[in-house]
Amino acid sequence: MRLVIARCSVDYVGRLKAHLPLATRLLLVKADGSVLVHSDGGSYKPLNWMSPPASLRVSTPDEVDLELGVTEQWTVQSAKTDDRLIINIHEQLHDTSHELGQDPGLIKDGVEADLQRLLADQIERLGTGFSLIRREYFTAIGPVDILARDADGATVAIELKRRGDIDGVEQLTRYLELLNRDPLLAPVRGIFAAQQIKPQAKVLANDRGIDCVTLDYDAMRGVDDSESRLF
């Protein structure tokens, strides 16, 4: 992991265009090829980023940029699309690299991990014709619990929680923003699934076009035998 604090401007060029004017920012260059641009606000969400696979090329700026104070130019090129992240660095304030090694990954709450496994095996609970793409679909901002396809072949990102609240909806929203930038997956819609979903979370999910599904954990485990009940 390389961490650079620099005065820089940033341009995203491709299917979308975005510009960040000159300011001091944190640049994260990860071993998987992803590059993320952070400010001192906005919580953990980057201002802009390039997802892996991608390549980073550092070059000397042209005469025009040199006159504007640019000392070096980073071009982060996506390997899948023509999208590029262009970072014009005016001054480096800090530059350090650390070998983090293999990360064991997020260890989920026991019930959440079991819900993920069970839903992957019973993906048809989300609707007729659903099929599993994979569990733990990794992105530059974290793993999507389950990626699936619906009966129409459209991509669906599923976020699983034991108790669904607003934070879970916000997390899924960030995943959807990122996944919909990938032409191989887009359009991607979201499903927020949990044993219990708070009313505020349902309202926010509905406002953002995200479906909510309440999961019966006991039934999924096969222990909810209604025929054996006395009452």
Swiss-Prot record:
Q: Which UniProt keywords apply?
A: Cytoplasm, DNA-binding, Endonuclease, Hydrolase, Nuclease
EC assignment: the record states 3.1.-.-
| Signal sequence extent | none
Q: What is this protein called?
A: Endonuclease NucS
Q: Which family does it belong to?
A: Belongs to the NucS endonuclease family.
The broad enzyme category this protein falls into is hydrolase
Its biological purpose is as follows: Cleaves both 3' and 5' ssDNA extremities of branched DNA structures.
